[in-house]
Amino acid sequence: MTLKQYNTCTLEAANYADPDAYVSDLALSYIWGDGPEDSIPEDRIQQLREIHRAAAMTVPEIAKAAGLNITQMSARFAVPYRTMQDWFSGARSCSLASRLMMQECLGLYRPPID
């Protein structure tokens, strides 16, 4: 997957609550340059599932997966505690880019970029 394809797939993930619909639509997207008779590679499907899973994770889910509490998350990412509280409670939303970077830094996610 190229960086441009990854960017498109990541940004599109926010538009889909249903992971299966996301995978289906993106697997068949024009971004791959597939011909009408080409089969969809299994690794593409797996990569898309992983992108959607990572994009859908909330900050509390990221913290839980990493075994960290709110105080540890705040310190680890140098984010004010109040901001982290707002992200945990849902009072404010954390950007997709920040959530993906948190997962990368914590070893929970590795973007499938060639």
Predicted regions: what is each one?
Residues M1, G67, P111-D114:
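Short intrinsically disordered terminal tails
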Residues M1-I51:
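N-terminal flexible/basic segments that precede or flank functional cores
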Residues L48-L68, Q103-C105:
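Short, amphipathic alpha-helical "recognition" segments used to contact nucleic acids or chromatin
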Residues I62, T71-R76:
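Short alpha-helical "recognition helix" segments of helix-turn-helix
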Residues F77-C94:
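Recognition helix of helix-turn-helix/homeodomain-like DNA-binding domains
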Residues S93-D114:
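DNA major-groove recognition helix of helix-turn-helix/homeodomain DNA-binding modules
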